[in-house]
């Protein structure tokens, strides 16, 4: 789920956020478009509770996904200044959820297949 757009006018943050939520629902304990933060064409917010039960509010913009708080529907100044931007939803989830990487094998062979080969 990379943010690849052919034209600057094609990007619509809220639509992309909903698409990410719909396609990645199984990869987190809770995943929803933020309800109480303002969205615009260029910026939307997503609430995530990882498989480890860690809470994040993530900003989605043309640049990618960026953590802005450790609470739902919140932008914390000290967190919002974070420079880490993830280009795709799967990079974000792999970066914040070790269980996601183990369970779904992002960037490597899925754990189940590795165990089968070892047997």
Swiss-Prot record:
The lineage of its organism: Eukaryota, Metazoa, Ecdysozoa, Arthropoda, Hexapoda. It comes from the Eukaryota. GO terms for molecular function: kinase regulator activity; protein kinase A binding. This is Protein GSKIP homolog. One of its GO terms (cellular component) is cytoplasm. InterPro entries: GSKIP (IPR037395), GSKIP_dom (IPR007967), GSKIP_dom_sf (IPR023231). Belongs to the GSKIP family. One of its GO terms (biological process) is regulation of canonical Wnt signaling pathway.
């Amino acid at each position: 789920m990379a943010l690849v757009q052919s034209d600057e006018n094609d990007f619509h943050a809220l639509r992309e956020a909903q698409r990410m939520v719909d396609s990645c629902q199984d990869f987190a304990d809770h995943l929803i478009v933020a309800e109480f933060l303002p969205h615009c064409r260029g910026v939307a917010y997503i609430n995530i509770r990882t498989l480890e039960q860690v809470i994040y509010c993530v900003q989605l913009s043309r640049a990618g996904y960026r953590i802005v708080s450790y609470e739902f529907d919140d932008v914390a100044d000290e967190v919002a200044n974070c420079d880490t931007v993830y280009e795709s939803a799967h990079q974000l989830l792999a970066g914040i959820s070790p269980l996601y990487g183990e369970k779904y094998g992002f960037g490597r062979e899925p754990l189940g297949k590795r165990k089968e080969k070892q047997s």
